[in-house]
Amino acid sequence: MTGGEGREVYRVDAPPTTMNKGLTPGDICMPPMPTPALIVRQEGNNAQTHPFVSVYEAYKKSSPNVLGVEALQGDDDCIGLKVNTADGYADYLFSVTDMQAHHPSGHVSFCGSLGVIREKEGKLQLMYLGCGRSLKKGNFVLESDRDVYAAIYMRHGVWYYSATGPVRVKMGKETKDLDEGYNQKL
């Protein structure tokens, strides 16, 4: 998260946040694992009306993996960050306070509570839509007619999806209408 005057930050272990295998990358935060979390108190700035995204990296190696965090173009209702890592990934993180379409970065459109896009060497590796209807980047689209939690991700050169409801996935010129499912091949 970008810095802010009057901000207090607390690190906590929250309860597990997902019960469905395949819904989160690497099945993180499934029982019995806790969810690493931060509690942020901000005087005079309500997160309900001013969104934020944070990056927290705990590491045991001699050096961190996060090389840099860059704030992306946003507006009062949408915030975005680009996170560059030592292992060659670029992660784009988006958060909004409304359910309108936003364009927080070039060639990206987003309508949801949380959006994540991961690229490696400019090639898409993952898209995650948290409680939303659409996430688009270039020729890749993840969308639904209702709010869903959904992801498309590449594992060992094969594309998979997970979703809590029906989704439409566009990859280049190919479009697939998919039902709810977890760790399903595309």
Q: What is the meaning of each model-derived region?
A:
Residues 1-35, 101:
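Trp/Gly-enriched beta-strand surface patches
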Residues 39-53, 57-186:
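Non-catalytic terminal regions with compositionally biased, polar/charged low complexity
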